[in-house]
């Protein structure tokens, strides 16, 4: 996630918080995030994966949940935990693992691009690079 934001010159804050092991810190973080100028929160969680939902219940800031692969259920437990939010407490849920993490950052960048022309130009350039890379691929005969 940080590499993606760095590519687009998007400032970010990274922090390790656990919904189960540091609940007071989690609530404090969520409640004070808006006051620090944070506009979006990406929360990765594995297993019971309560972090994204608990953060979403404590702030009006959009929360994006990324399921982290787990040893026993390969992240399916995390995915189901994050995606099954009750109505009224939304969490945008992404794919399990690295693809979900990268896409969550790109989703934030896409939202920022709607009101930031510089970010929009970088996003268009990024997607053009992706397109070019695919078009240049060769299949082995």
Q: Which role does the model predict for each range below?
A:
Residues 8-11, 36-39, 59-63, 86-91:
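Short coil/turn connectors at secondary-structure junctions
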Residues 29-67, 71:
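Glycine-rich phosphate-binding loop
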Residues 2-3, 7, 26-31, 74-88:
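Active-site-proximal loop->helix
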């Amino acid at each position: 996630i940080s590499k993606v934001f760095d590519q687009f010159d998007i400032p970010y804050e990274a922090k390790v918080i656990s919904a189960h092991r540091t609940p007071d810190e989690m609530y404090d973080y969520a409640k004070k995030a808006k006051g620090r100028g944070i506009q979006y929160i990406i929360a990765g969680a594995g297993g019971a994966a309560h972090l994204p939902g608990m953060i979403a219940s404590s702030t009006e800031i959009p929360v994006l949940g990324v399921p982290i692969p787990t040893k026993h259920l390969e992240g399916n437990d995390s995915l189901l935990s994050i995606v099954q939010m009750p109505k009224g407490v939304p969490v945008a849920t992404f794919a399990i693992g690295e693809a979900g993490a990268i896409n969550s950052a790109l989703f934030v960048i896409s939202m920022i691009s709607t009101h930031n022309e510089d970010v929009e130009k970088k996003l268009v350039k990024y997607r053009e690079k992706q397109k070019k890379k695919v078009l240049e691929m060769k299949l082995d005969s």
